Amino acid sequence: MFDILAITAPIYVAIVLGYGLTRWGVFQKSDMRGFGTFVIKVSLPAMLFNALSNTQVKEIFQPIYLAAYALASLATLALALVWSMKFKRESFSLSSCYAMGMSCPNSGFVGYPVVLLSLGPFAGVVLALNMIVELFLIIPILMAWADAQEGKNSAVQVVWQTFNGMLKNTLLWGIVLGFLFSWFEIQLPQSLNRSVTLFAQASGALSLFVIGGSLVGLSVQGMGPRVSQIAFGKLILHPLIMLAVLLWVLPISDPVLRAAAILSCAMPMFGIYPILTQKHGHEGLSAAALLAATMASFFSLNGVLWLLKTQSI
C-alpha cells in the first residue's frame, strides 16, 4: 500500500499546496485562472505534441481503446440522464449537469499526472486519446442536451457551435500536429524541441496546483444529496462501467492500456465543469460536486490503484 501512496501522495501534496497558498493569501484565487489558462493553452498542448510526435503511429492509433473509452463514457452519460430525468424529474439542463459531472474526467489536470506516475511516459498518448473522445463526442452531446429544452438553438446548431469553438482549441492542435509529426516522422530542430519540452514539463505540477487553488471558497452546504450522487457516479460508477466494457464487450489485451482506461474513468470531473454549466445556472452545484469529488478521489484513486496492482484486471 505504501508504494501506491508513493504514487498518489505527490499529486495530492501539490493540490493541498495550491489550496493552502491560495487560502493564506500568497496567491489570489483569480491567479488560478491565469495559471489554468497557461496550462490549457500552452503547457498541455506542448506536452501532447511532445508525447505524440515522439511516439510511433502504431502506438498512437488504438481504436479498441478509443471505442471502449467512448462506450463507457456514453453508457455513464446515458445512465445519468435516465436517473436524473426519469427518477428525479430534473430539467434537461440539470440532467446534463449530472451527466457531465459523472462522465467527463479531469484527464489533463489530474489524470495525466496520475497515469504518468503510475504507468510511465505513455500517459501523454492516453491523454490525447481521452481528449479526442471528450472533445468530439461527450461534451458536444451534453451541451446540445442542456440547450434542448430551451429551444433557442437546434441540437445541430449547438453541436456545430461546439465544434467551431474547438478549432480555436490549442489542445486539439497539439494532438493534430503531434500526430502529423509522428506520421511523417518529422523531427523538430534540437533547440526548438528543448523549448517545447520545457513548456511540456510545466504541465504536471502547475495543473495540480491550479486544482487546489480553485477549490478555495467552494462549499457543499445545502447540496449534499445531489453532490454525493454526482461524485459517486464519477468516482465509482464510471470506472465500474469501464471495467464491465473491458470484461464483456471490448477487451483490451495490453495491460497498460487496460489500466489506463480504468484509471482515466476513476478521475474526478474536469476543472471547467462549473464554467460549462454556468450558462444554465448550475455552477454552484457543479463547483460543490467538483470539490467533493476531488477530495474523495484521494481514497477512491488509491483503492483503484490497489485493485489494479493486486488483482488481475
Name each model feature, range by range.
Residues M1-I313:
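Alpha-helical transmembrane segments of multi-pass small-molecule/ion transporters
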